[in-house]
A protein has these predicted regions:
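Active-site-proximal helices and loops of the catalytic beta/alpha 8
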Residues: 149, 167, 258-379, 383, ...
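Acidic/polar low-complexity flexible segments
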Residues: 659-681, 751-775, 827-885
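Carbohydrate-interacting/catalytic domains
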Residues: 2, 11-20, 25-52, 67-71, ...
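Surface-exposed, glycine/proline- and aromatic-rich loop segments on solvent-exposed faces
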Residues: 670-673, 677, 694-785, 848-849
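Short, compositionally biased P/S/T/A/G/V-rich stretches that sit at domain boundaries
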Residues: 567-590, 668-712
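Substrate-binding/active-site clefts of carbohydrate-active enzymes
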Residues: 42-48, 56-262, 266-267, 287-299, ...
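Structural beta-strand segments of beta-rich domains
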Residues: 590-596, 720-722
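Short, well-ordered beta-strand segments enriched in hydrophobic/aromatic residues
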Residues: 501-507, 720-731, 818-824
Length: 885
């Protein structure tokens, strides 16, 4: 079946004590000894599974460290330290190991700025350094870090440290970034007072932070980035007002190199995840990593000849394009000039998996993304793959558990290094919730979350075991052999290594789907044995290829199965239904309904299955004369040029004709069905139900032309599809959001006449009720997310159950319009749009946590003001839109 791969961790080599001691002084005057057991040989990284954790939010092992007396500790606040530490990580190594992870990636353990009064936020996360060479007091000390490394290596596991070179904390600022003049770099510059408690200070050269008019020094004397599309700002301005290091300065480079050589030399770190890579000039990476006094030399000196460096180049790609990959590729390469990073985090794949699995978009998007991954990157087998992380909304905030299982199967089964973000194995839905009892939880339920018998823990454990024990899962060639272009549906791929093969099949749709005559490229009679299944308890234990090497399956909604090829061979009989079509529709383009006619066995019961959807399959009764005809309706087809498939199929005999591929070309009218004029309100920096709310004070919120104000809405309909186009006061994309706009989020409530049984009047999370009537589904659309939820489980604090497909978003920044297309399936596939109602509201959501920004009485940089926290979070809204047909 499989060629079994011995546990790769059994091959770990701990360097002899004599070598470790000899290396303890390399490149440093530091006297801290190297712990025995700290230095081990590098693994083959493609065989690894990484568990990523935030130190502060993972586990509290030493409560004496929690409160340092500076009002920086508060487990009830998402902004402050919660109490996790390095001892806590050591205490839970068995939990991580038993899950199946073989490496641990921790957030930066270095000493941080504890509180930034300017941003009203804390440095619990580790990315706001004040000293790159010390362990933060909340996390422990050098001894506890060395102990963690020693214990990790004793378990035949590996340790990856998150590092930052682009910036430190927020110790200086500019009062008005929009008036910055590069020729006068110190104009508007201001050192921030009381950024560090008494007794703390910045080391040299980080303490050289008085602005220099000649532009030299330890920092770039620039304000916060106002335009992420500007390459100069990207490389030299401040990210989120964090002081941007002048990484071209020799003293800064020397300090950073020695800082990170130290963690390899004195702790025994096995790899670096590198933060904010794209904000630093390319030449820096060549020097920092590959110079004689660089990181890689230190790694080799400690016996690590395959030290992994993977960077955060936060770039995604639109469907069927590769702009993200192209940017990422410029930072990879350990040969040629300049040498740079080993690898990068696979953001384009993550975004595509979210589109396909959580939002119900075409599975062919994933086919394209995986093929480009294999074609474009020099070694995709060592690219870390992930479904979410600490800097974005959790997968489960926008998708279901079954959606996430499909994403995890994909992540574990495609080439690359799987990365499991802490809490995924406990089905967490909040971005930075603590795992330990008493740590911060968004829902206020401060419970322990280390259940090793939870559904997701056991599921990931099973996947990890399959991957770790079989070479084909880590090293096999990949080929996508099935995908749907019209929407959610079938996705299938293989991994092949020598005589071993894995077949992965899944259905991303809410409906049962026909995987029709999938070519598995094997000889007829080849037998595949089930290994793992999701959401399909009675999935076939074996699949047998027919005489043509094809497999046909009726896949339940949201199901997935992994099969492995066996050495067995069985014969299989395929019924002959004698189906012949009267017209060849293959490759044809249609602009409306068509009639499909043909012949088959007399009186046969058949079905017209369009786009594989068995739930909407039309029954065909063949006449006594052997003739049949059936109308294929385009009412529920998406707008634009779309590729489809249909089959004439017998659900009774599990056989039919091969899929016929065709194209539909439907278009929106240039004239809207309805127009709603909403200009004049929610402007001039004021909004809310009574016009008394004020915008957050951060300068990226436009007080004159608010991004949250809707001036006009237009409604377009074709068949059962609806487009809502909003003309906004202003559209910005300051933060390069994947959906093309930021500083506004739409919550749109839909009242669907065909879904009234569980309707609600309360509007989740925004402290309001429907102006009239009730709602059936709600769409949440902002720069980083597009999702639809039904009312199952919905209440004042919960959106409900995620359903697909989500609205597709199109932005025309020049004309200040945002269009959202609601496919027929998003509206419950109605036969008529008559009576469907939309209630549209705006507010801003945090792109990290997918939570609505707070409403407070007092002004703040990231909170709305002028109201109580329990008042409605609606900046602007529209009168209820009622459709008629």
């Amino acid at each position: 079946m499989f060629e079994t791969l011995p546990n790769p961790m059994n091959k770990i080599k701990i360097l002899p004590l004599a070598i470790a001691l000899a290396l303890s002084g390399c490149g440093s005057d530091e006297t801290t000894p190297v712990d025995t057991g700290s230095h081990v040989a590098s693994p083959d990284w493609q065989d690894q599974i990484i568990y990523f954790l935030m130190i502060d939010r993972f586990n509290d092992g030493d409560s004496a460290l929690n409160d340092q007396g500076q009002n920086e500790f508060d487990p009830t606040s998402d902004k402050k330290f919660s109490g996790g530490d390095l001892v806590g990580v050591s205490d839970k190594l068995s939990y991580i190991e038993d899950l199946g992870a073989t490496s641990i990636w921790i957030t930066p353990p270095v000493a941080n700025q504890w509180w930034d009064a300017e941003q009203n936020y804390g440095g619990y996360h580790g990315y706001w350094a004040r000293d790159f060479q010390k362990v933060d007091e909340h996390f422990g000390d050098m001894e506890s870090y060395q102990a963690l490394a020693r214990e990790v290596h004793a378990r035949n596991m590996f340790l990856i440290q998150d590092i930052v070179t682009n910036h430190v904390g927020n110790f200086f600022t500019y009062d008005d970034p929009y008036s910055y003049d590069p020729s006068l770099p110190c104009q508007g510059f201001r050192l921030i007072k009381n950024t560090l408690p008494a007794g703390q200070e910045l080391p040299y050269p980080l303490n050289m932070n008085e602005c220099k008019t000649d532009g030299t020094g330890s920092y770039h004397w620039t304000p916060t980035i106002t335009d992420h599309n500007d390459p100069v700002q990207e490389k030299t301005w401040q990210l989120s007002d964090l002081d941007d290091l002048n990484t071209s300065d020799p003293e800064v480079r020397a300090y950073l190199k020695e800082s990170y050589r130290k963690w390899i030399r004195e702790v025994g770190v096995d790899g670096f995840r590198i933060d904010t890579v794209k904000f630093v000039e390319h030449d820096f990476w060549n020097d920092f990593l590959h110079a004689d006094d660089g990181v890689m030399t230190q790694a080799v000196d400690t016996g690590r000849d395959n030290f992994l460096t993977f960077g955060e180049v936060f770039e995604t790609s639109t469907p069927y394009h590769t702009e993200g990959e192209e940017k990422m590729l410029t930072y990879i390469g350990e040969s040629g000039s300049p040498k740079q990073l080993t690898s990068v985090l696979n953001f384009p794949l993550q975004a595509t998996m979210t589109r396909v699995f959580a939002s119900g978009q075409p599975t062919d998007y994933l086919r394209f993304r995986l093929e480009k991954m294999m074609d474009m990157f020099p070694n995709p087998y060592i690219m870390p793959n992930f479904i979410d992380n600490h800097d974005m909304p959790r997968f489960l905030s926008q998708g279901s558990v079954n959606d996430m299982k499909q994403a995890l199967i994909t992540m574990m089964a495609v080439p690359g290094i799987p990365v499991i973000y802490q809490g995924t194995e406990q089905a967490m839905s909040a971005a930075r919730d603590a795992m330990f009892a008493g740590g911060y939880r968004e829902d206020g339920n401060y419970v322990d979350s280390f259940d090793q018998n939870s559904e997701m823990y056991l599921f990931i454990q099973e996947l990890a075991k399959l991957r770790t024990e079989n070479k084909v899962m880590t090293r096999g060639e990949m080929k996508v052999i099935g995908s749907d272009k019209a929407g959610a549906g079938v996705f299938a791929f293989t991994r092949t290594l020598d005589n071993d093969e894995v077949l992965v099949v899944m259905n991303t749709s809410n409906s049962p789907m026909l995987m029709n005559q999938l070519d598995v490229e094997q000889a007829g009679g080849t037998v595949f044995q089930q290994q793992i299944m999701s959401n399909w308890a009675d999935a076939p234990e074996q699949l047998i290829a027919d005489e043509n090497g094809h497999v046909t399956l009726e896949l339940p909604a949201k199901s997935a199965v992994i099969y492995s090829k066996t050495s067995s061979n069985q014969s299989v009989d395929t019924p002959d239904l004698n189906i012949q079509l009267a017209q060849d529709w293959e490759g044809q383009t249609i602009t409306g309904d068509i009639v499909i006619a043909g012949s088959a066995n007399a009186n046969e019961k058949l079905n017209l299955v369009v786009d594989g959807n068995l739930e909407t399959a039309q029954t065909i009764t063949v006449g006594a004369d052997g003739q049949f005809s059936v109308t294929l309706s385009t009412r529920h087809f998406a707008i634009g040029e779309q590729q489809h498939r249909f089959a004439i199929y017998s659900t009774e005999k599990k056989a039919g004709i091969e899929d016929v591929n065709f194209v539909s070309d439907l278009s929106w009218s240039n004239t809207p069905d309805d127009t709603i004029d909403d200009a004049g309100d929610a402007q001039d920096g004021m909004g809310g139900p009574n016009g008394n709310y004020s915008l957050p004070t951060d300068p990226t919120f436009d007080k004159d032309n608010s991004q949250l104000a809707i001036n006009k809405a237009e409604v377009f309909t074709v068949g059962s599809n609806v487009r809502l186009t909003f003309t906004m006061d202003k559209i910005t994309d300051t933060w390069l959001p994947p959906n093309g706009f930021d500083h506004v989020g739409f919550t749109i409530f839909m009242d669907l006449p065909e879904e009234t049984a569980t309707n609600l009047s309360e509007l989740p999370k925004i402290n309001a009720s429907m102006p009239s009537g009730t709602w059936s589904r709600n769409a949440v659309v902002f720069g980083w997310q597009s999702s639809i939820y039904n009312t199952k489980g919905a209440n004042a604090t919960t959106w409900g159950e995620a359903v697909t497909p989500a609205p597709t978003v199109t932005v025309d920044k020049a004309n200040n319009t945002i269009s959202m297309d609601f496919a027929s399936d998003a509206l419950g596939r109605p036969d008529s749009l008559d009576g469907i109602r939309f209630y549209v509201t705006t507010w801003d959501l945090d792109g990290l946590s997918a939570t609505y920004r707070p409403l407070e009485q007092d002004k703040g940089p990231w909170s709305f003001s002028g109201g109580a926290s329990d008042e409605s979070k609606i900046w602007d809204d529209l009168p209820i839109i009622t459709l008629s047909e």
